[in-house]
Amino acid sequence: MITIRIDSLIELMDRVAPPELALPGDRIGYHGPEIEVEAVLVLMDYLEDVAVDGYDLLVLHHPPEVEPPIPYLTVHSNWDVADGGACDALADALGLDVESFLDPDTGVDRICRADLSLEELLERTGVLNPETLRVVNPREYVDRVAVVSGFGLSDKSLIMRAWSEGVSAYLSGDLTHGPAILGRNMDLTLIDAGHHATEMPGLHRLREVIEDFGVMAELLDTGTPWSEYRAAYI
């Protein structure tokens, strides 16, 4: 493993996740002074109880809600969109072949060939270790699946695009009541595997990319930011 100047590391990262791919208003980029980087910690979210001793740099997927104590680089929607980035990592983890996009203007999604029973597709989500799976409009067979890393089921416009593109199922996270009703009325199968679970393949790949640069990188999975309680406790 090597030691690298932060500006050189940023230049390498910009090649795999170009900043111009980021969605408008996304708070990506480097925050910190000029440093030498020997050890990197990759996180989905920075939490104040995360031990950062021994690391020179945090590489974060989500922009932090509180300021970390050491320099950090946020790689968010530009990594979701990038060729080989988070959305492609999700499709690869599920064993799906990418064929096109729901939203070619942003590239924040992937449409994949499937030719699977719904049960087979749900079994494949086991590699994501989802806390739960929520399914709207179960069907026996799916031939084309749209996937979005993280937030996709909260976006009604993407659900509308999935329906208009004729996909049989749309898999992502962050499903809420309104989008679920929209999908149900459209007879579109929605599969909510969770924001965290659908983003983890992209985080593993991000760590691998940094190590491919020759820099020591570790990934810490901080999990979902809540605990689930069943009705028996209410």
UniProtKB/Swiss-Prot annotation:
Keyword line: Metal-binding
Known InterPro entries for this protein? Answer: DUF34/NIF3, DUF34/NIF3_sf
Cellular-component GO terms for this entry? cytoplasm
| GO molecular-function terms, A-Z | metal ion binding
Q: Which residues bind a divalent metal cation 2?
A: H62, H195, E199
Q: Does the keyword Metal-binding apply?
A: yes
Quaternary structure? Homohexamer.
- Similarity-based family: Belongs to the GTP cyclohydrolase I type 2/NIF3 family.
Q: Which NCBIfam families match?
A: YbgI_SA1388
Protein name from the UniProt record: GTP cyclohydrolase 1 type 2 homolog
The taxonomy runs: Archaea, Methanobacteriati, Methanobacteriota, Methanomada group, Methanobacteria
